[in-house]
Swiss-Prot record:
Protein name as it appears in the record: Large ribosomal subunit protein uL3
Lineage: Archaea, Methanobacteriati, Methanobacteriota, Stenosarchaea group, Halobacteria
Residue ranges of the region described as Disordered: 1-44, 151-170, 206-259, 312-338
Organism, scientific name: Haloarcula marismortui (strain ATCC 43049 / DSM 3752 / JCM 8966 / VKM B-1809) (Halobacterium marismortui)
Cleavable signal peptide: none
InterPro entries associated with the record: L3_arc_euk, Ribosomal_L3_dom_3_arc_sf, Ribosomal_uL3, Ribosomal_uL3_arc, Ribosomal_uL3_CS, Transl_B-barrel_sf
Entry annotated with the keyword Ribonucleoprotein: yes
UniProt gene name: rpl3
Subunit structure: Part of the 50S ribosomal subunit. Forms a cluster with proteins L14 and L24e. Interacts weakly with protein L13.
Pfam families with a match to the protein in the record: Ribosomal_L3 (PF00297)
Length: 338
C-alpha cells in the first residue's frame, strides 16, 4: 500500500528559484551595534578546498585537546578600498539615502563599474550628515567599498566588484568619525582589521549555475516506478494538480532554472587569516591557480565555484562563543589532481 501522506519534496523557503540578478551578493541585515565602531563586512575570491589538522578547542567535548582533521575553503582576501561614505536618513517609509562623502583617490579601473563624481564637495556633504544627526534623523552609515582584482592574479578580471558595507558599533557620532577617517585615509582596509581567526562569520555567495533541470534534480521528487515508468516518462511528475482550482499552483515541482542562486550560510568558523602560499596545493588549485597573498581559511564549504566573489559578515546569530586563534598544526598541500 502506498504511503498515505508525506512531507512535500523540496523547500519553498528559497523561491522563486531564478537566477541571481548579480554575482555580487547582498546582505539585508547586519549585526547589532556592540563594541567599538568598525566595518561590518569584507569580500574575497574563492580559490578551492583543502584540509587542516588542528587541536579541538571545544569546551566539554570528549575530544577536547585532541587533533582532528577539518575540511577548509581557501579564499583569497586582498585589501579592499572604501571610496565613499553613504549616509541614510530615517523617514516614515524606512531608510532613504541622504548624501555621500567621496574620496579624491580612486582606483584606475573603478570607472569600469561606476561613474566617479568629478564636481563633489565633501565638506558640504559632511555638514549635511551632521545636521541630520543633530536632528535625530540619521540612520545607517555605510561605506561604498570595492575589491582590487589587480591584487589577485588568478582572477582574470579588471572590473572591481562594488558593494555597500555597514559601519557598526559604538555611538552614531563614533561611527561617523570612524567612517570619515577611513575614507579620508584612502579607504584601504584588510581582512584582519575586521575579523580574527576563530570567530564566526556569515558567508554569502552565488552558487554554481546548472541551467534548466527537471523536477527530479531541481526538487528531489521520486522517479516513477513500475508501470508508471513504462509509459516512457520516468523523470516527470504525475500531474500538475487538481481540477479545482483551475490553475497550476506555484508549489507544484516543475522543471526550470537550477543553481546560480544567492545563498547565505550562517556561523562559518574562520580557521586562519594569514598571508603567503602556505595553503596552496601542489600544482595549484584546479581552475584557479596559486594563492600567494592574503588568504582566509573557512571551515567547511562555501557557496559558488572557484574564482567567484564571496562576502563575509560578522555572525548575526552566533550559536557559540568565539574560541579565538585555533591551533593549526598542519595544512595539507596535497594536489587536488591526484
Amino acid at each position: 500500500m502506498p504511503q498515505p501522506s508525506r512531507p512535500r519534496k523540496g523547500s519553498l523557503g528559497f523561491g522563486p528559484r531564478k537566477r541571481s540578478t548579480s554575482e555580487t551578493p547582498r546582505f539585508n541585515s547586519w549585526p547589532s551595534d556592540d563594541g567599538q565602531p568598525g566595518v561590518q563586512g569584507f569580500a574575497g575570491y574563492k580559490a578551492g578546498m583543502t584540509h587542516v589538522v588542528l587541536v579541538n578547542d571545544e569546551p566539554n567535548s570528549p575530544r577536547e585537546g585532541m587533533e582532528e582533521t577539518v575540511p577548509v575553503t581557501v579564499i583569497e582576501t586582498p585589501p579592499m578600498r572604501a571610496v565613499a561614505l553613504r549616509a541614510y536618513e530615517d523617514t516614515p517609509y524606512g531608510q532613504r539615502p541622504l548624501t555621500e562623502v567621496w574620496t579624491d583617490e580612486f582606483h584606475s579601473e573603478l570607472d569600469r563599474t561606476l561613474d566617479v563624481p568629478e564636481d563633489h564637495d565633501p565638506d558640504a556633504a559632511e555638514e549635511q550628515i551632521r545636521d541630520a544627526h543633530e536632528a535625530g534623523d540619521l540612520g545607517d552609515l555605510r561605506l561604498i567599498t570595492h575589491t582590487v582584482p589587480d591584487a589577485v592574479p588568478s582572477v582574470p578580471k579588471k572590473k572591481p566588484d562594488v558593494m555597500e558595507t555597514r559601519v557598526g558599533g559604538g555611538s552614531v557620532s563614533d561611527r561617523l568619525d570612524h567612517a570619515l577617517d577611513i575614507v579620508e585615509d584612502g579607504g584601504e582596509h584588510a581582512m584582519n582589521d575586521i575579523f580574527r581567526a576563530g570567530e564566526y562569520a556569515d558567508v554569502a555567495g552565488v552558487t554554481k549555475g546548472k541551467g534548466t533541470q527537471g523536477p527530479v534534480k531541481r526538487w528531489g521528487v521520486q522517479k516513477r516506478k513500475g508501470k508508471h515508468a513504462r509509459q516512457g516518462w520516468r523523470r516527470r511528475i504525475g500531474n500538475l494538480g487538481p481540477w479545482n482550482p483551475s490553475r497550476v499552483r506555484s508549489t507544484v515541482p516543475q522543471q526550470g532554472q537550477t543553481g546560480y542562486h544567492q545563498r547565505t550560510e550562517l556561523n562559518k568558523r574562520l580557521i586562519d587569516i594569514g598571508e603567503g602560499d602556505e595553503p596552496t596545493v601542489d600544482g595549484g588549485f584546479v581552475n584557479y591557480g596559486e594563492v600567494d597573498g592574503p588568504y582566509t581559511l573557512v571551515k567547511g564549504s562555501v557557496p559558488g565555484p572557484d574564482k567567484r566573489l564571496v562576502r563575509f559578515r560578522p555572525a548575526v546569530r552566533p550559536n557559540d562563543q568565539p574560541r579565538l586563534d585555533p591551533e593549526v598544526r598542519y595544512v595539507s598541500n596535497e594536489s587536488n589532481q591526484g
